[in-house]
Amino acid sequence: MRLHLLATLALAGCVSQPLPPEEAEHRAAAVHLKEAGSKTTAAEQRAALYLASAAESYDLLDSPKSREAARELYNKAATDLVLLLRSSDNGAMWNRPLTLTSGGTTWRLRYAAGNRNGTWDPGRFTSFTAASEVGLKTIDVHNRQDGIGGALVGVRKMNPKEPFAPPIAGITAPVTAVLDFKGRDATLTLVDPSEEPKARVKGSERTLDADFSAPLAYYPQRSEFWTGLMGALRVSHHMGTTGLYMLQPYDPDRIPLIFVHGLISTPQMWRNVINEVEKDPELRGRYQCWVFGYPTGNPPAYSALRFREELAKVRELYPNAKDYVLVGHSMGGLVSRMQATTIDREAWNVIGEDKAAKFFSKVKKGDLIDRATTFEANPKVARLVFICTPHRGSEMALGSIGELG
């Protein structure tokens, strides 16, 4: 929370001394915001107090003396209102019209429906976290913009787990909560700042307050090196980590940009690369970032098979998805390359026809080894980006590290 807002809330309790005009102007909003934070007050009354604070701040958004403080109070009220409504009584107040009363004042609140033009469906998310509460220790550059609205991380975590959802945290997204008022009628809109960097608030287009790093930093961070090492050395304990994971809700209008890590690594290695993609408005408007994770102690051909199977599931679930761009580092480049390569049994004659014939004489059509060694290029792969990929093999495989496999 900004120091200016902390000072405003502190002064809200000081009724015995006169306030400067610029602070007196938004004192009522600060008082209501402070009262709304009381956990001993009923949730419905707290929600009404948050609306009162937001409405009073809303009226001052264009005030020359108070607009900065008013914006901070408005943003805080919008953030805390969403957190309260979504979490109270298992979401009983969420995504339905509400009539809320506090201090003799009655408010009517409605939720704006989601659409394809930058507004989230309120029912999409199972929980929210204030973006300001997410730790950013693993993020090199904090990617955010200052503006109007409550900056949140929207989380969708279902049970049973949905396809392509990260297993621990679920799918996350940047969300900005905006409240608009007509008298005592309020509309709560959840804006996707990735698509709409601005919103109309109080009749004017205003830049949204948004945090694009927090949804990425929300995912639990484990030791990348040790997790990657164990995935290389104790494969059987890490088979369940294999999968394709969407880090954002699926968007049919954006290109899947799929990152594939290398040897002794995990998808966490890409967090700051993805953060840089999200930093660029043009890139984040064009691409949606996914990751493929796998224990690197498995043969690359097997990991490539699992990757093919995951991409086949995407095509089945989202047949109209845009063609993919794959980014592979080291071994991940080999795994990615095999998605755009066709290999049949005849291709294996390069090792010698007799050897190939002997090998395939023991392989049944359609079994695991057959599917891992013969396959067709995926027509949905539009582009490949290789980073330090040993296309012609690596001398490392001949040494002690190679013997581990």
Q: Where would I find each of the regions flagged by the language model?
A:
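Sec-dependent signal peptide recognition
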Residues: 1-8
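Flexible, membrane-associating and regulatory peripheral segments of lipid-active enzymes
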Residues: 14-257, 266-272, 288
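Amphipathic alpha-helical segments in well-structured domains
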Residues: 270, 274, 304-307
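A generic local structural motif
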Residues: 243-245, 276-277, 313, 370-372
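Short amphipathic alpha-helix adjacent to the substrate-entry channel of hydrolases
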Residues: 271-287
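Serine-dependent carboxylesterase/thioesterase catalytic core
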Residues: 52-69, 86, 90, 257-263, ...
